């Protein structure tokens, strides 16, 4: 007896993108890539799998990502610990060091692709999701920090988004954070009675992250904690003031959020998030900041750097709420045909039209004209090319507008096959 195969579904939190939504993804990526090119950013592609120690070192041992959220396994061939990337910055920095990219000049680079985190799936939070990761490697001043924020404001405008807000903070330099850390630990020790289990566990290993709590019982304690901003030295304040001045020059409003720390340990000086109220609890659309010590931490020479990451699923959700996105057609031209000779001719004509730069579907199989026209209309094609018995005999094609022109311009016309491509292209 043959055993019935149990149907396989996608892993929870890892979603399929089907042809309709995929077309919107392609349109979205087209806008994003054009926007990035306009600022001089070039594409890089790094592996989905990296050595686990890259993320443990780069992101931080005592972070939610490293402690709880990474997909990690042991390579059966050599025993290496490997991890599916939970973010892209560490991999891009690793690549820049390995390939000596930073030897003689800075680089503006970006990557678009999937990342993986073992989280509880919900709207805006998935186990496989996609990021747009943008990095400026080798740039030290607040001018590049400001440019990144300004370019994001431009993207929101390109996408027609109105209600995305900027939150800003400075994490200073290591010595300033050390002084703040000591004061913060004292504060946490005085309020141990309100700390939850996670807060008590992190009190000494990562006290700054204790303030980034969603626990209502800890909010008053977090609000009264020493502010890192008060520990900043002259150079850090100057960098932040320079950033704020440039944002004012660009007319970009922001809210200073002293509790904004981000979930990755490599940040220093500038950190920022763009947030919205329209995505529920997962309201952060984009986050980033400066990470001047990461290249050296991962074995490279001291190199200033700044970057950000955008969650594509969240931004797509927001975009689709904000504007009406037209469903792209499957093709420009749909060829219908009659008889075996018509079908064979249609295949040749389809290739000729593609040579001319047109997107063409040739109806597959044999069917009556009514069924073929129904499928042609469903494809979204502007024009149907008809190769019936008369057309095959006279080496012509009939052109029928399915959508677009009206009146005389929409009348069906018959043209010689040799002129078909030119006539179709003239119809836009």
UniProtKB/Swiss-Prot annotation:
Keywords: Aminoacyl-tRNA synthetase, ATP-binding, Cytoplasm, Ligase, Nucleotide-binding, Protein biosynthesis. It comes from Bordetella pertussis (strain Tohama I / ATCC BAA-589 / NCTC 13251). The lineage of its organism: Bacteria, Pseudomonadati, Pseudomonadota, Betaproteobacteria, Burkholderiales. Pfam families: HGTP_anticodon, tRNA-synt_His. One of its GO terms (molecular function) is ATP binding. The gene is hisS. The keyword Protein biosynthesis applies. Homodimer. It catalyses: tRNA(His) + L-histidine + ATP = L-histidyl-tRNA(His) + AMP + diphosphate + H(+). This is Histidine--tRNA ligase. CDD domains: HisRS-like_core (cd00773), HisRS_anticodon (cd00859). Belongs to the class-II aminoacyl-tRNA synthetase family. GO terms for biological process: histidyl-tRNA aminoacylation.
């Amino acid at each position: 007896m043959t055993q019935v195969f149990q149907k396989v579904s996608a892993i929870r939190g890892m979603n399929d993108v089907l042809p309709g939504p995929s077309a919107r993804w392609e349109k979205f990526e087209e806008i994003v890539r054009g926007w990035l090119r306009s600022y001089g950013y070039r594409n890089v592609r790094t592996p989905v799998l990296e050595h686990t120690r890259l993320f443990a070192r780069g992101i931080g041992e005592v972070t939610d990502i490293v402690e709880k959220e990474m997909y990690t396994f042991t390579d059966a061939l050599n025993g290496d610990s490997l991890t599916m990337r939970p973010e892209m910055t560490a991999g891009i920095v690793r690549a820049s060091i390995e390939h000596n990219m930073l030897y003689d000049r800075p680089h503006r680079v970006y990557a678009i692709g999937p990342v993986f985190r073992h989280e509880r799936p919900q709207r805006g939070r998935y186990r496989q999701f996609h990021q747009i990761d943008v990095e400026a490697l080798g740039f030290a001043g607040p001018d590049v920090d400001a440019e990144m924020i300004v370019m994001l404001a431009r993207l929101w405008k390109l996408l027609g988004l109105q209600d995305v807000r900027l939150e800003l903070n400075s994490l200073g330099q290591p010595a300033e954070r050390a002084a703040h850390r000591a004061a913060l630990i004292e504060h946490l020790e005085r309020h141990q009675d309100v700390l939850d289990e996670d807060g008590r566990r992190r009190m000494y290993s990562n006290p700054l992250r204790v303030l980034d709590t969603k626990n209502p019982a800890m909010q008053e304690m977090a609000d009264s904690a020493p502010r890192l901003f008060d520990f900043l030295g002259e150079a850090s304040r100057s960098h932040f003031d320079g950033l704020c001045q440039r944002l004012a020059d660009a007319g970009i409003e922001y809210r200073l959020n002293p509790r904004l720390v981000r979930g990755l340990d490599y940040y220093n000086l500038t950190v920022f998030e763009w947030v919205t109220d329209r995505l529920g609890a997962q309201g952060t659309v984009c986050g980033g900041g400066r990470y001047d010590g990461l290249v050296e931490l991962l074995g490279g020479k001291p190199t200033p750097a700044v970057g950000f990451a955008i969650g594509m699923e969240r931004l797509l959700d927001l975009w689709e709420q904000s504007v009406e996105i037209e469903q792209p057609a499957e093709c420009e031209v749909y060829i219908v045909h009659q008889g075996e000779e018509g079908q064979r001719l249609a295949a040749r004509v389809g290739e000729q039209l593609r040579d001319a730069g047109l997107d063409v579907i040739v109806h597959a199989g044999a069917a009556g004209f009514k069924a073929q026209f129904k499928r042609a209309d469903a494809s979204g094609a502007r024009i149907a090319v008809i190769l019936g018995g008369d057309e095959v005999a006279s080496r012509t094609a009939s052109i029928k507008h399915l959508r677009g022109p009206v009146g005389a311009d929409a009348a069906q016309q018959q043209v010689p096959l040799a002129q078909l491509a030119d006539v179709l292209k003239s119809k836009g």
